[in-house]
Amino acid sequence: MSKAIIVADLKYKSPKRRGRGTGHKGLHSTLKYVQYREDHNAKASAEKLRDRWQDRGLGAHYREIFEACDRLKSKHVLAWTWVVSPAPDLMALVPETRRRDLVMDVTERVVEAYYEARGYQTPPYSYVLHDRLTDEGEQQLHTHVILPGLAP
Protein backbone atom coordinates (compact mmCIF):
# COMPACT_ATOMS: atom_id res chain seq x y z
CA MET A 1 0.00 0.00 0.00
CA SER A 2 1.37 3.42 -0.93
CA LYS A 3 1.70 6.27 1.52
CA ALA A 4 0.30 9.76 0.97
CA ILE A 5 2.91 12.43 0.34
CA ILE A 6 0.52 15.27 1.12
CA VAL A 7 -2.75 14.89 2.97
CA ALA A 8 -5.43 17.40 2.05
CA ASP A 9 -8.56 17.51 4.19
CA LEU A 10 -11.42 19.46 2.59
CA LYS A 11 -14.57 20.32 4.55
CA TYR A 12 -17.17 23.05 4.64
CA LYS A 13 -18.99 25.11 7.22
CA SER A 14 -22.71 25.47 6.64
CA PRO A 15 -24.37 28.83 7.36
CA LYS A 16 -26.96 26.92 9.42
CA ARG A 17 -26.19 26.04 13.01
CA ARG A 18 -26.60 22.28 13.46
CA GLY A 19 -24.60 21.70 16.60
CA ARG A 20 -21.19 22.49 17.99
CA GLY A 21 -18.70 23.89 15.48
CA THR A 22 -21.27 24.72 12.82
CA GLY A 23 -22.90 27.85 11.47
CA HIS A 24 -21.57 31.37 11.81
CA LYS A 25 -20.52 30.83 15.42
CA GLY A 26 -18.62 27.67 14.46
CA LEU A 27 -16.72 29.43 11.67
CA HIS A 28 -15.93 32.42 13.90
CA SER A 29 -14.59 30.10 16.63
CA THR A 30 -12.55 28.06 14.15
CA LEU A 31 -10.95 31.15 12.59
CA LYS A 32 -10.07 32.61 15.99
CA TYR A 33 -8.60 29.30 17.17
CA VAL A 34 -6.55 28.85 13.99
CA GLN A 35 -5.17 32.39 14.29
CA TYR A 36 -4.18 32.22 17.96
CA ARG A 37 -3.12 28.57 18.31
CA GLU A 38 0.51 28.44 19.38
CA ASP A 39 3.12 26.29 17.70
CA HIS A 40 4.61 23.40 19.66
CA ASN A 41 8.01 25.01 20.08
CA ALA A 42 7.32 28.61 20.97
CA LYS A 43 5.13 30.65 23.22
CA ALA A 44 4.20 33.56 20.98
CA SER A 45 2.74 36.92 21.88
CA ALA A 46 -0.82 37.69 20.85
CA GLU A 47 0.59 40.41 18.59
CA LYS A 48 2.80 37.94 16.70
CA LEU A 49 -0.05 35.43 16.38
CA ARG A 50 -2.34 38.18 15.08
CA ASP A 51 -0.13 38.61 12.00
CA ARG A 52 0.14 34.99 10.92
CA TRP A 53 -2.48 34.83 8.14
CA GLN A 54 -1.24 34.76 4.56
CA ASP A 55 -3.80 36.92 2.75
CA ARG A 56 -4.58 35.89 -0.81
CA GLY A 57 -7.60 38.17 -1.11
CA LEU A 58 -9.82 37.02 1.78
CA GLY A 59 -8.24 38.87 4.71
CA ALA A 60 -5.37 38.99 7.17
CA HIS A 61 -7.26 38.68 10.48
CA TYR A 62 -9.91 36.23 11.61
CA ARG A 63 -12.60 38.94 11.86
CA GLU A 64 -11.86 40.22 8.36
CA ILE A 65 -11.91 36.66 6.97
CA PHE A 66 -15.17 35.91 8.78
CA GLU A 67 -16.84 39.02 7.34
CA ALA A 68 -15.61 38.17 3.82
CA CYS A 69 -16.92 34.60 4.12
CA ASP A 70 -20.29 35.89 5.33
CA ARG A 71 -20.45 38.27 2.36
CA LEU A 72 -19.36 35.56 -0.12
CA LYS A 73 -21.37 32.60 1.18
CA SER A 74 -23.60 30.40 -0.92
CA LYS A 75 -26.97 29.03 0.10
CA HIS A 76 -25.43 25.89 1.62
CA VAL A 77 -21.77 26.79 2.28
CA LEU A 78 -20.48 29.58 4.50
CA ALA A 79 -16.81 28.67 4.02
CA TRP A 80 -14.56 25.90 2.78
CA THR A 81 -11.84 24.75 5.16
CA TRP A 82 -8.83 22.83 3.91
CA VAL A 83 -5.86 21.42 5.77
CA VAL A 84 -2.73 20.80 3.68
CA SER A 85 -0.27 18.58 5.52
CA PRO A 86 2.89 17.17 3.92
CA ALA A 87 4.09 13.85 5.38
CA PRO A 88 6.32 14.56 8.42
CA ASP A 89 8.88 11.89 7.50
CA LEU A 90 9.36 13.45 4.05
CA MET A 91 9.56 16.97 5.47
CA ALA A 92 12.35 15.75 7.76
CA LEU A 93 14.47 15.36 4.60
CA VAL A 94 14.18 19.10 3.90
CA PRO A 95 16.63 21.42 5.67
CA GLU A 96 14.84 22.94 8.67
CA THR A 97 15.42 26.51 7.48
CA ARG A 98 13.49 25.81 4.26
CA ARG A 99 10.53 23.83 5.62
CA ARG A 100 8.14 26.67 6.43
CA ASP A 101 8.60 28.34 3.03
CA LEU A 102 8.21 24.97 1.30
CA VAL A 103 4.90 24.19 3.04
CA MET A 104 3.59 27.66 2.22
CA ASP A 105 4.62 27.25 -1.44
CA VAL A 106 3.02 23.79 -1.60
CA THR A 107 -0.20 25.18 -0.10
CA GLU A 108 -0.47 27.91 -2.71
CA ARG A 109 0.30 25.46 -5.52
CA VAL A 110 -2.34 22.99 -4.24
CA VAL A 111 -5.04 25.68 -4.12
CA GLU A 112 -4.14 27.12 -7.52
CA ALA A 113 -3.82 23.70 -9.20
CA TYR A 114 -7.16 22.55 -7.76
CA TYR A 115 -9.01 25.40 -9.46
CA GLU A 116 -6.90 25.41 -12.62
CA ALA A 117 -7.62 21.69 -13.18
CA ARG A 118 -11.34 22.47 -13.02
CA GLY A 119 -11.15 25.48 -15.33
CA TYR A 120 -11.88 28.07 -12.62
CA GLN A 121 -10.08 31.19 -11.56
CA THR A 122 -8.55 30.86 -8.08
CA PRO A 123 -10.96 32.50 -5.60
CA PRO A 124 -9.81 34.72 -2.76
CA TYR A 125 -8.44 32.73 0.17
CA SER A 126 -6.29 33.00 3.27
CA TYR A 127 -4.21 30.48 5.13
CA VAL A 128 -2.16 30.09 8.28
CA LEU A 129 0.84 27.84 8.94
CA HIS A 130 0.91 25.69 12.08
CA ASP A 131 3.74 23.65 13.54
CA ARG A 132 2.81 20.72 15.79
CA LEU A 133 4.35 17.46 16.92
CA THR A 134 2.86 14.11 15.92
CA ASP A 135 2.25 11.40 18.54
CA GLU A 136 5.64 10.01 17.50
CA GLY A 137 7.34 13.37 18.18
CA GLU A 138 7.87 14.34 14.52
CA GLN A 139 7.43 17.93 13.39
CA GLN A 140 4.21 18.31 11.41
CA LEU A 141 4.02 21.58 9.55
CA HIS A 142 0.60 22.10 8.00
CA THR A 143 -1.64 24.89 6.79
CA HIS A 144 -5.28 25.74 7.38
CA VAL A 145 -6.81 27.27 4.24
CA ILE A 146 -10.08 29.21 4.27
CA LEU A 147 -12.08 29.87 1.11
CA PRO A 148 -15.50 31.57 0.83
CA GLY A 149 -18.65 29.51 0.31
CA LEU A 150 -19.13 30.80 -3.24
CA ALA A 151 -15.83 29.23 -4.29
CA PRO A 152 -16.62 26.36 -6.67
Task: Annotate each predicted stretch with a short phrase.
Residues M1-P152:
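N-terminal nicking endonuclease/strand-transfer module with a His-rich metal-binding environment
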